[in-house]
Amino acid sequence: MLGGVGGRHMSTRRRGSSPLVRGGAGLTGYAGPGASGNSNDVAAIPPDMQRYAGRRRRAVTTSDHKSCALVQTRIKLGDIMLAAQEAAQRDPGYASQYRRRPRLAGLSFGDWTSFGGEVPGLVDMAPGRDQGGGAGGGGGGGKGTTSLFILSEDNCIRKHTRFIIEWPPFEYAVLLTIIANCVVLALEEHLPKQDKTILAQKLEATEIYFLGIFCVEASLKILALGFVLHRGSYLRNIWNIMDFFVVVTGFITAFSQGIELDMDLRTLRAIRVLRPLKLVSGIPSLQVVLKSIIKAMAPLLQIGLLVLFAIVIFAIIGLEFYSGTLHKTCYSIRDINVIVKEGEQASPCNTDNKSEAPFGAHVCDANISTCMDHWEGPNFGITSFDNIGFAMLTVFQCITMEGWTAILYWTNDALGSTYNWIYFIPLIVLGSFFMLNLVLGVLSGEFAKEREKVENRQSFLKLRRQQQLEHELYCYLNWICKAEEVILAEERTTEEEKKHILEGRKRAEAKKKKLGKSKSTDTEEEEGDDDQDDGELSSSTKEKGPCKQFWLAEKRFRYWIRKSVKSQKFYWFVIVLVFFNTVCVAVEHYGQPQWLTDFLYFAEFVFLALFMLEMFIKVYALGPRTYFDSSFNRFDCVVISGSIFEVIWSEVKSGSFGLSVLRALRLLRIFKVTKYWKSLRNLVISLLSSMRSIISLLFLLFLFILIFALLGMQLFGGQFNFDSGTPPTNFNTFPIALLTVFQILTGEDWNEVMYQGIESQGGHKKGMIYSLYFIVLVLFGNYTLLNVFLAIAVDNLANAQELSAAENEEEEEDKQKQAQEIEKEIQSLQNPKDGGAPKVEICPPNGKGGKQSSEEEKKQDEDDDTGPKPMLPYSSMFILSPTNPVRRAAHWVVNLRYFDFFIMVVISLSSIALAAEDPVWEDSPRNEVLNYFDYAFTGVFTVEMILKIIDLGIILHPGSYLREFWNIMDAVVVICAAVSFAFDMTGSSAGQNLSTIKSLRVLRVLRPLKTIKRVPKLKAVFDCVVNSLKNVINILIVYILFQFIFAVIAVQLFNGKFFYCSDESKYTQQDCQGQYFVFEDGALLPEPKKREWQSQFFHYDNVMAAMLTLFAVQTGEGWPQILQNSMAATYEDKGPIQNFRIEMSIFYIVYFIVFPFFFVNIFVALIIITFQEQGEAELQDGEIDKNQKSCIDFTIQARPLERYMPKERNSVKYKIWRIVVSTPFEYFIMGLIVLNTVLLMMKFHRQSDAYKNTLKYMNMCFTGMFTVECILKIAAFGVRNFFKDAWNTFDFITVIGSIVDALVIEFGENFINVGFLRLFRAARLIKLLRQGYTIRILLWTFVQSFKALPYVCLLIAMLFFIYAIIGMQVFGNIALDADTSITKHNNFQSFIQGLMLLFRCATGEAWPNIMLSCVKGRPCDAKAGKQEGGCGSNIAYAYFVSFIFFCSFLMLNLFVAVIMDNFDYLTRDSSILGAHHLDEFVRIWAEYDPNATGKIHYTEMYDMLKNMDPPLGFGNKCPNRLAYKKLIRMNMPVDVDLKVNFTTTLFALIRENLNIKVRRASERNQANEELRDTIRSIWPLQAKKMLDLLIPRNEEIGRGKMTVGKIYVCLLILESWRTTRFGQIESAGQPIMELQDVVVSDSRAGSLESLTHTGKRLHPPVQPVRHPSRSPSLRHSPGRPGYDHHGHYYHEGPGFSDTVSNVVEIQRHTHHPHPSQYNHRHRMRGPWSASTSPARTPSPIHHIDRGRHYGTTSLEQRSRSPSPIGGRQPPHTHQHYHRHHPHQHSYPVLVTRRGRGRRLPPTPNKPSTLQLKPANINFPKLNASPTHGSHIHVPIPAGMQHPPPGQHLPPMQPSHCPLSFEQAVAMGRGGRLLPSPVPNGYKPQPQAKQRTPRHSDSDEDDWC
């Protein structure tokens, strides 16, 4: 069937496709003249069938083009298309030929190629292709691909090798070999000094076998595929290149035993581990992850450049300030080679004389040591700023937030602590919080896009397959029906059959519904079909007669049990059981009494029995099948089986290890709660749904770690041998290497490992190259792969929220439906015959009715905040009525304008007072004074509270004082302060209990929070944070639950095993008695110390301790130490043995994946999503989205830029200006900056004097050059204009700073310390930033996100303030000790120090250690005057944990949220207009309006929009019709001078592009009003001034007012009129080539309208001369009324005039350049003059000056010639006024003359096959460039008549030599635009050239 097509092509037919099928040439079945096929067969198909065959062919061939990749490689489709078209033109009959070939009728392209030689015609058609290409069907380039020049395609060896390498078992064998090779590499243990274990020696012997196998594989592939020369050969595949490389290096290592190689080349074999990735490409979810990472690479590179730039700038600043400062340290006076340490490490010093040292610097104790410059520096000398390499590494390390505080403290020691924070804090904020979070934004955007793409693609493929099948089925059915109709016309389907069909359909529908409704979660028991089961039961009962009664009873009993099992009571009973079980597990702890142990032991059995019972009951009630349908039940069953197994096992073999973990899994049963808790359920579902992506990501991560671990083993194995022993993080064995890589991946202490790695390879002199290994690991692992976790989390959470929203909507709908049904029933009951009963509305029509009204009430309450509030109508405190004078006075005071302001001032003053207190010495004079201030402040707040209570009442009625949260807080603070003062005053014994008072006084800290209520925007951010906390509660529950589960497991595993003896040689508490000797460095005798049996600070002895420890691990701080302790843990009450149980690390790895990688990211994701939703929620009322808001924001703030240009053309100033703004000058300066940067980077520590002087003089040269640049610019622009541009001001400051700096260096630095001037050297680099377009946009967005941040920052500042004050009050008096974390650098002894400490904690630097240094029992500071060990407090735990929680989870995530919000355009569809595009508009506008008048002529506006690339402008490929239509919709008003306004144009453009309330013409006024309201509500302040500019009033665009819309409507009508009317007039049978078919210079191509709709168009013999305006202004038409001299127009018979008479006035105003302002040479220019001056050529020579002037300069012109001078000169009366010439109409006169036609030369823009027969033609606008003068059109005086239609008037010739037609056209084609320089340094984007031929405007949408 189907015309004889064989079955073997069915599959191909369904899949194959090609663009060709849709091609115009109709090639679908063409097989060339030689194709086989019997043409008589056609008769065998009935005509109907033929019709279907055609349709069938179309159905089959519209398929996805990707599936025919094979075809694309074998045949170039484009060639065939062209060949087919040529064939069609040569032989018109050919196209119909194929229809008679039934054999090929239904074949798509893919089928021909499967025939190979059967289609000779195909191959012949492709020109320039190998003729033998099709025959072999092979890869590459056809038959000619001989492998290695020897084996042809048909060679049997090659055929067999090809078969082998494509044989699946061969591929698997190779993969297995690779895995085996990796295992061998992993089994090696690396020993110091190249020693080898026996195993390693044996493994080395296997090396040669692997090499052999890989060599064989490579040879086979090379034989089969060829080596490199043709497509598809061996080395054309990236994997093969890698293999080949590995084999070659293998041979080099194998046969280079005698040669000493510096590096073991076996490292390179680790690269082969990448090969299993080939398998990966088949897994869709992995593809999403991989693709999104690869796709993100482009934007990531941009960000990478920005980060690199920041690193270079900071490194150069560091080089200038800190070079060589870290080499001084304290050396002992006794032995000058011994370093005197402070604490555990040596630290830099400044001097050993206290009087000389700056504040905060480290001074050596002069009695025992001296400060000398011999030290290599901290961290083996790697951490330093001695040269640019070290400086960049150090800066990069700071950006990763690891070890940055140590560097800060060292620089403080060396230089004093006054200024260093100014360098480090911006580095952290910009580098870490901003730059690196950008990576996250980009990745999550790409991930979401990629996932959506994959999902869409899958659904599309499904749908398409379904449609194809349906289509085929439909065709077949149609044929069958036809056949049936023909044969059995009288038979019809019987009623019974019909019934059958309908029933079938119903069943299918029911099934579909059921599938759709099934719950998306498996957490609940399947509600199995009761009736179905009963049916089965009854049938079995019937059969068994005798036991009938028993079965019936059993059935009833089972039914009852099933009911009970499904009831809520049973469910809650199980939940309570789970809860008790949880409690029992949680109370277990170290050192518990025996009775508790016994009780827990028996309780375990009881719970196990109960849970087993529950399971059996359920299985009985629901039946095994239904029971096991639910995945939760399956999980339950597994847990119970595990528990039974565990109980038996522990009886048999007690003390066994690790199985107890199974017990902990029972806690997962708590998730049963999700059955009734929707949002939690959806969260769990979304977590489960993201498992797929996460598992694939984990696989990727595992591969990554594996590769780097093997690489690390090869590089650093056996090398980490230091004086202090081998560190725990090393690369000696595979498991430890994996852990080390994993640790670096989490980012914790990666810098320490790097220092050890560099030191092991020869220290900072030789081993610096090895830092690359660690940097790549951090960049790719930590910043890229781990951020994909967050991307996945953000993505899936958004899904979960959508799920919840969708479910809520469904519920609402259901309720509504029910309500409506009830309503209907009631109506039908009530509805009497007369129908007069009233309607009853039970439920308001919109489902959210009730909710909305309450929300509106709330809103109204809130809105009243702005105005003065009316007094509440209730009596206050039952005493004061609303009319009471006291209450009225209080009300008046509280609502005074400045009352709130006054309170704000008092709050700020009291905050300052709090910060100024001295926390150490409580009775210091400063504190005494501040105390009195405090009384005053408290007094003010008390008075405020009393007044408010009098005004509002206390609590009983709505709106009273204590009904608001903020007031409650105020009251608490005031009362606490009052109570503490009372204690103070009385001095009673209670007052002695200082801690009570102190804690009461600490509450004063909350005062700053009062400001939140008073600053609306701050309150909005605060509400957002609170809301996101509400949202986070769900995840918090899941989070705490998981944390709890892990804590329970940890207690089971490590309970009581974290003890150790201070003498490391003892292992038990019994042995750890007495004393031991400690040898100190440099001490002669050992020192005896007492042995102590201690527990580690972080341990797992009970659940609470375990939770705290895990929280610390999860923040990623200090966890390697905890991991080492866990792996060393042996047995309860025994000491540690290093790496005793390495498998314990699995616990931490799993924990890390679940928590930091996943849960914490979900937190971040939730906050981000909430933040974004909040932002959008504000806009919902106005019905505009975020992007639209940011664009309107931009418009409101945008102002036109002023571009300066000297007036006198011949002045020196003008010449200087020309130089300064020229492109070469810009590039020269850029080059200087780059060279200067390189010069700055060349400095290094301990450089020779000659080198130093060379650098100094070169620096002076550069300073000189920049000074010259500055002077030139000031000369060119004038002082005022120069400083208008921010960049110039910046340049000027930089230059002045550099000059002063140079002078200081030259004439000695003694007279003033100007170190900061060195900053100016680095500042020049910043100028580089304004060059690149992408960087410019990135920076712009950066600034935007800073604008969005102030309130977020304020909130963070408040958080820091409050915590710093609490820290000062509670921990301020702890003694400083270099051995703990409370040191002179890091403490709470002043407010500033406290802030620094908190900032350090926020970046996560060793916060657990600080927390442990603040707990109870710490030594006190000497000034505090307290007993020893009485300082510190256990509040420290809550204090630090809460701070870290708020900081790292909430606050810093707000940064991330803001950044992701602002930078979403990086991954958004680039065709959507965003605020970041709008800068370009302001820039280009300035070129048309240099004086920043804010207005330009509407034709210039058209030009400008055509010159701007989409999405902002129209682009120069946009057909004019479409541009007109857009302008008509934009419809800006035009003023008297026909100019449009800047703001109005920009807003109209945005509105048109983003579709902001764009409606039909009839509804436009209403839409405008709505938009005005929206703008008033969102921008109340700006709306007053700007509203009429943004949205012009109806009066401005109504009747009698001129608008852009009206002008272009006329042009559009005119155009349509010409096409219809002219099209009917035949002119000698030859179409005339229209003006528009001539090529136009690219930039102005847009300014000529294309009028061709059909390919040929006819014109009347005479066409009026084209008007030379700047862009399409209105044209004259033949029937157009002329003008008389005074503006009265006369008619010439009915023409187009009736249609467009209302726009006649425009023509009179269309302007021309000012003739009077050019010298004679310019004035006499004819229409074709070769001058490139700004006037728009051609133009009539003589003009009349009407006194209007419009002086603008376009800076994007071809010309370098002068622009008009003297913008406001009085008009000259022109002497040529009365000499009119007959070609006043500005259209070219095209007259057809037979026999004298010439063909136009071929043109790139618009190839045209039409012929042109011109006489002398006046072509305007061939070389158009933006004008500088106003256009004035001279009307024809009344006496002049239009030329009669037949008569041809010779055009005016130019006064110099005439040009031939070809010359003119050539000149026009040469009119290319050269971008001219602009003063501001921006470069116009190069316009994309138009390549594709454009045949007509009908395909408008493809152009814009």
UniProtKB/Swiss-Prot annotation:
III repeats lie at residues 890-1177. GO terms for molecular function: calcium ion binding; high voltage-gated calcium channel activity. The keyword Zinc does not apply. Residues 23-35 have a biased composition (Gly residues). Residues 188-205, 260-264, 323-419, 588-602, 650-658, 717-769, 915-930, 982-994, 1053-1141, 1251-1255, 1303-1309, 1368-1431 are extracellular. Residues 523-536 have a biased composition (Acidic residues). SMART domains: Ca_chan_IQ (SM01062). The record marks 402, 748, 1117, 1405 as: Calcium ion selectivity and permeability. InterPro entries: EF_hand_dom, GPHH_dom, Ion_trans_dom, VDCC_a1su_IQ, VDCC_alpha-1_subunit, VDCCAlpha1, Volt_channel_dom_sf. It comes from the Eukaryota. Residues 1430-1471 are annotated as: Phenylalkylamine binding. Residues 1670-1681, 1727-1740 have a biased composition (Low complexity). Signal peptide: none annotated. Glycans are attached at residues 353, 367, 993. It is a multi-pass membrane protein. Residues 1-45, 513-543, 827-869, 1652-1694, 1710-1788, 1870-1904 are annotated as: Disordered. Ca(2+) binds at residues 1489, 1491, 1493, 1495, 1500. It is found in: Membrane. Keywords: Calcium, Calcium channel, Calcium transport, Glycoprotein, Ion channel, Ion transport, Membrane, Metal-binding, Phosphoprotein, Repeat, Transmembrane, Transmembrane helix, Transport, Voltage-gated channel. I repeats lie at residues 155-447. Each of the four internal repeats contains five hydrophobic transmembrane segments (S1, S2, S3, S5, S6) and one positively charged transmembrane segment (S4). S4 segments probably represent the voltage-sensor and are characterized by a series of positively charged amino acids at every third position. Belongs to the calcium channel alpha-1 subunit (TC 1.A.1.11) family. CACNA1I subfamily. Voltage-sensitive calcium channels (VSCC) mediate the entry of calcium ions into excitable cells and are also involved in a variety of calcium-dependent processes, including muscle contraction, neurotransmitter release, gene expression, cell motility, cell division and cell death. Interacts with CATSPER1 and CATSPER2, leading to suppress T-type calcium channel activity. This is Voltage-dependent calcium channel type A subunit alpha-1. It comes from Apis mellifera (Honeybee). The lineage of its organism: Eukaryota, Metazoa, Ecdysozoa, Arthropoda, Hexapoda. The gene is CAC.
